[in-house]
């Protein structure tokens, strides 16, 4: 079995303000783990990790304004291949 790494880029699904960041570069995350929250129109939208892996970078900090499709984070995912 061979292990390969893929990079997953997490984009903002909507315009808003970064309300909370729960992870930092180097942290290990699991698929569907909440990694940050965006606030828009007084509603909080959680952002979840799309895969298991390690946080490579966080492109935002709490209080930042973001636009739809801005890069929020990058995760190095691990996948197994036979």
Task: Kindly give the residue locations of the regions a language model identified.
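Glycine- and charge-enriched low-complexity intrinsically disordered segments
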Residues: 68-82
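A short, glycine- and basic residue-enriched loop/turn
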Residues: 26, 44-47, 52, 63
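Short histidine-centered loop motifs in beta-beta connectors
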Residues: 20-24, 57-60
């Amino acid at each position: 079995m061979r292990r390969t790494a893929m990079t997953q880029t997490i984009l903002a699904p909507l315009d808003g303000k970064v309300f909370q960041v729960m992870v930092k570069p180097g942290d290990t995350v699991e698929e569907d783990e909440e990694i940050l929250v965006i606030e828009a129109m007084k509603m909080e939208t959680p952002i979840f990790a799309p895969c298991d892996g390690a946080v490579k970078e966080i492109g935002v900090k709490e209080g930042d304004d973001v636009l739809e499709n801005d890069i929020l984070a990058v995760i190095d995912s691990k996948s197994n291949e036979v």
